[in-house]
């Protein structure tokens, strides 16, 4: 019979340009051992953590935990008032310092600003 004039797909000059071909590489024995040791180490640490976490969860009461973590509105209001007083004291001290410096400059220079 005659020759087929159909070209195979992918046969040409620029086929596969820019495409990286990933080669399958086998995992080395050292890498296997290292990974196995890491997995065993993580399993061992999780095995020791689980019983302690279960014990802690069963001993504490949920209502008690909630009371410890919530902020009390009265305490917040008191703290805000205390903070505002402290800020006001800082402002007054700053203004006193500025006035004192201004007076000193006026005394040194001999005229008022």
From Swiss-Prot:
Where, per UniProt, does this protein localize? Nucleus
Q: Which UniProt keywords apply?
A: Nucleus, Transcription, Transcription regulation
Assign the protein's first listed, main location to one coarse class: nucleus
An individual GO BP term: negative regulation of transcription by RNA polymerase II
Q: Which GO terms describe its molecular function?
A: RNA polymerase II transcription regulatory region sequence-specific DNA binding
Any one Gene Ontology cellular component term annotated for this protein: nucleus
Name the source's superkingdom.
Eukaryota
Q: Where is the composition biased (Basic residues)?
A: 1-11
According to the record, the residues making up region (Disordered) are: 1-35
Signal sequence, renumbered to the chain: none
Protein family per UniProt: Belongs to the ADF1 family.
* Protein role: Transcriptional repressor which negatively regulates transcription of FYV5 by binding to the promoter on the sense strand.
State any further remark. Encoded by the antisense strand of the FYV5 gene.
Name the chain's protein: Antisense of depressing factor protein 1
């Amino acid at each position: 019979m005659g020759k087929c004039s159909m070209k195979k797909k992918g046969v040409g000059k620029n086929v596969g340009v820019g495409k990286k071909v990933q080669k399958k590489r086998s995992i080395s024995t050292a890498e296997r051992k290292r990974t196995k040791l890491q997995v065993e180490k993580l399993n061992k640490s999780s095995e020791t953590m689980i019983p302690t976490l279960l014990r802690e969860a069963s001993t504490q009461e949920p209502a008690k935990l909630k009371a410890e973590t919530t902020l009390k509105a009265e305490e917040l209001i008191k703290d805000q008032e205390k903070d505002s007083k402290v800020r006001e004291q800082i402002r007054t001290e700053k203004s006193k310092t500025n006035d004192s410096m201004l007076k000193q400059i006026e005394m040194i220079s001999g005229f008022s600003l």
